[in-house]
From Swiss-Prot:
GO terms for cellular component: extracellular space; plasma membrane; synapse. The keyword Membrane applies. The N-terminus is blocked. It comes from the Eukaryota. The active site is at S76, E132. It is found in: Synapse; Secreted; Cell membrane. This is Acetylcholinesterase. GO terms for biological process: acetylcholine catabolic process; choline metabolic process.
Length: 181
């Protein structure tokens, strides 16, 4: 059914959609709106601080699902979080990250640099992971081929062993003891 919510700047249209646990309010053009309240955006990435908030199982209705399967997908640090969730589940898909990676277990006090992008001190999630480790670093570009990528075309093919960061990097192809061609 159609919903109308009054705001300071007028009405916002929305829909009440049926789901297994009841109804969900969806307001058009208002991301992260609170249902039945004046639509206001929540803090960006609020659930990113506790990834378990993104996992929802309808308590009391599990029997309706017969064989309940939950797929958790995460890349990079998200994959490390998915791996941590494996401690209480059976299977998961990890992409470029693992819970036993040294960086996945670093305490905030030990962290040498903040994650980017950060707006007003809060993590701001983006929807891409190409060159994610160099985002915000001078000389690198997310939108086009950067000068550094043009000058060193094989830069992305060099693997750094994070257990031994001073080893100079190992090429991913060819003879690992010879310089990369």
């Amino acid at each position: 059914s159609e919903l109308k919510v009054a705001t300071q700047t007028g009405f916002v249209r929305g829909l009440s959609l049926p789901v297994l646990a009841g109804h969900v309010s969806a307001h058009l053009g208002v991301p992260f709106a609170e249902p039945f309240l004046r639509p206001e955006p929540v803090k960006p990435g609020a659930e990113m601080w506790n990834p378990n908030l993104n996992i929802w199982v309808p308590s009391g209705r599990v029997g309706a699902f017969x064989f309940l399967t939950v797929t958790l997908f995460g890349e990079s640090a998200g994959a490390a979080s998915v791996g941590m969730x494996l401690l209480s589940t059976q299977r998961a898909i990890l992409q470029s990250g693992a819970p036993n990676a040294p960086w996945a277990q670093v305490q905030p006090a030990e962290s040498r640099f903040p994650f980017v992008p950060v707006i007003d001190g809060e993590f701001f999630p983006l929807g891409v992971n190409k060159d994610e480790g160099s985002f915000g670093v001078p000389g690198f570009s997310k939108x086009x081929e950067s000068l550094i990528n043009q000058a060193v075309p094989h830069a992305n093919d060099i693997y750094t062993d994070w257990q031994d960061q001073d080893n100079g990097g190992l090429p991913l192809t060819g003879n690992p003891t010879x310089p990369h061609n």
